[in-house]
Amino acid sequence: MVNLSIFKQIKNNMKKIFAIAILGLAFNVKAQTIESSSHSTTGYVKSDGTIENSSHSTKGYIKSDGTIENSSHSTIGYIKSDGTIENSSHSTVGYVKKDGTIENSSHSTIGYVKDNGTVENSSHSTIGHAGNVKREWAAVVFFFFKFN
C-alpha cells in the first residue's frame, strides 16, 4: 500500500521551494547595485527609482517624471527628457549625453557612464560601477547629488 501523505508532503515542499526561488529572482531584478571602483557595494537603485545606501536605508527617490527627491520627499532636482539635470530651482547643473558623457553646467566633461555600467571621471579613471542602472540615474548618484 502506497502512503499518499509522503507524496503530499513532497508536493508541498516543492511548492515552497518554487515560491522561494521566484521571490529570490524578484529581489534580484528589483534593485541594481551601486559599487565603488573596488566593487564594494555603496548602495542600490531599485527599479522604481528608490535610492538606498548599502544598509538598504532609503536615501532618495527618482520619480518616473524625472523628479529627484531626498529621503523626506523634498524635491532636490529634475532629470529632463533631453538629459539635462536641474537643481530644485530649475537651474541646470549638468547634462547626460546619449553617448554617456557627463557634463557640468558649462558643458565641460566631468565623467562618463559606459554601456557596461562602469562610471569614470573626466580622466577615464574608474570611480564606480552602476550595472544596469539607467545612465541618467547613475549620473545623478555619482556626479550631481549626494544621498548620504
Where are these regions (language model features)?
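Intrinsically disordered, low-complexity proline/glycine-rich segments
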Residues: 32-148
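Positively charged n-region of N-terminal signal peptides that target proteins for export
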Residues: 2-4, 8-17
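Sec-dependent N-terminal signal peptides
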Residues: 17-26
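Short helix-onset patch at the extreme N-terminus, typifying the N->h transition
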Residues: 7-8, 20-21, 36
